[in-house]
């Protein structure tokens, strides 16, 4: 049975991400906030997933809202100390402004069309304070080609057996993750995830057209400038006032 992205992957997500150093990632996000948006007022997280970063940083802000397009992922969050809302990052339902907006886990790569990426930037511009910052990370082609070669991963979590098959199609610049999940009885599920691996210059071009300037573009997890062979980029946008 084919299901929507993260409908069943949410049940095995922690197993898939068990090697991720959430503490270091959270500290990196906070350092970016300190450098570019030191007010630490109202924060909005886009694509919060299972809330592992949210749980570590929300207390640093006066108000914290974690959002995700997957209701199942938000349901898996155990910490109830912050607000949660299910919504599409390219169509934000807010009338209030935020001082710091961020997205992690290359969630932005799930926007498969440039018009959707532009929609995200325009939506963020509407709800970002004039002095605020928007930061997000993206996966680049080097990551898909060199680090995530065609591979199959299998495992068990919460009574489910799963298999993940990953591959990259260079011509379309689409990175594919296919999940096969079974409860060991008669229930078998298929989830197909796609991510668009945009060229780095695409983000710069769309930023300017949507009213942003690129305040920084780091080699992800560092504060060094991006390089041609970087695997991931960390952008910091500021509004053009």
Which ranges hold each PLM region?
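A short SAM/SAH-binding and catalytic strip from SAM-dependent methyltransferases
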Residues: 99-115
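SAM-dependent methyltransferase
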Residues: 135-206
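Conserved class I S-adenosyl-L-methionine
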Residues: 1-47
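Class I SAM-dependent methyltransferase SAM/SAH-binding core
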Residues: 50-91
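C-terminal lobe and adjacent flexible extensions of AdoMet/dcAdoMet transferase-like proteins
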Residues: 200-241
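A short acidic, Gly/Pro-enriched loop at the edge of an enzyme's catalytic core
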Residues: 90-100
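A short glycine-rich, Lys/Arg-flanked "PGG" loop and its adjoining helix->strand segment in the class I
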Residues: 118-130
């Amino acid at each position: 049975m084919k299901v929507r992205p993260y409908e069943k992957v949410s049940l095995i997500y922690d197993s898939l991400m068990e090697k991720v150093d959430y503490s270091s990632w959270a500290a990196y996000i906070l350092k970016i906030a300190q450098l570019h948006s030191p007010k630490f007022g109202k924060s909005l997280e886009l694509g919060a997933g299972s809330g592992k970063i949210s749980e570590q940083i929300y207390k640093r802000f006066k108000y914290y809202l974690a959002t995700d397009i997957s209701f199942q992922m938000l349901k898996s969050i155990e910490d109830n100390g912050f607000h949660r809302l299910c919504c599409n990052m390219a169509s934000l339902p807010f009338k209030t402004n935020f001082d710091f907006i961020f997205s992690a886990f290359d969630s932005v790569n799930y926007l498969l069309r440039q018009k959707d990426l532009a929609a995200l930037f325009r939506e963020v511009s509407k709800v970002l304070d004039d002095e605020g910052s928007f930061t997000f990370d993206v996966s680049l082609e080097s990551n898909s080609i060199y680090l995530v070669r065609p591979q199959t991963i299998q495992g068990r979590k919460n009574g489910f057996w799963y298999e993940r098959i990953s591959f990259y199609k260079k011509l379309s610049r689409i990175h594919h993750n296919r999940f096969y999940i079974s409860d060991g009885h008669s229930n078998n599920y298929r989830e197909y995830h796609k991510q668009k691996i945009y060229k780095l210059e695409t983000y710069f071009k769309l930023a300017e057209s949507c009213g942003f300037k690129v305040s920084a573009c780091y080699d992800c997890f560092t504060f060094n400038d991006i390089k041609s062979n970087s695997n991931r980029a960390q952008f910091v946008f500021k509004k053009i006032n």
